[in-house]
Amino acid sequence: MAILEVKGVSKYFGGLAALDNVNLTIQEGEIRGIIGPNGAGKTTLFNVISGVYRPTSGQIFYMGETRIDGLASSKIAGMGIIRTFQRTALYHDFTVLRNVTVARHLHARENIFGVFAGTVKKLEEENLKRALEIVEFMGLGRLKNELASNLPHGHQRALGVAIALACEPKVLLLDEPLTGMTPTEKSRMIDLIRKVHQQGITILMVEHDMRSVMELCHYISVLDFGRLLVEGLPVEIQNNEAVISAYLGTEDISSLGGEKVAT
């Protein structure tokens, strides 16, 4: 079943086409890689899907029939499409647990039924319980009382994903989740992404680390100059001449076949 469909979406800034007639069909339960050279339109695509930007033209459908292009980002998030950002948005003066609890509170505020279904105290207890579960799930349990500002970069990125999970995503948009990480941090995050996916969450991932993309993703869409260049399985993308040409001068992805990410 298609959980997300992007149909003929374009986004212009002045006379510049950041996205040009992009069509994507994301199947429920997949991990989809969105790759391309710098300036290809990857983050703009995420911004359009998540409601940060309205598309200039085209349509986006969620769960088959619900059209979401043009909806407010808070509305889209409340429907279960949650994104992370290249620069993790944290409350740096809050603890790890408090960051996740606040995200739970904000999510519950969008759920009117939840507000009326129980007392405020009960909701607070449920939010705290769920926040603790998420913190443990993301491997941050021993750091739950640590200030976010004191965390190493890799743990801050993990906390960013934990905050996203607090909003109960059905579709999770990960914008460069591995950027700036050491090899050890990267391996840890890759394992966490797999764990998140095993919870039944569909994942779209923008990432420049091609080895990790080839290892993690079931299917890959390649953007170049705002257009969808090609789609395919990882092995197909590795050997596609158009993709290799687009990446010349950055990284030769044809050399990545068969390599595994260290765990």
What name fits each language-model region?
Residues 1-263:
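Glycine-rich phosphate-binding loops of nucleotide-dependent enzymes
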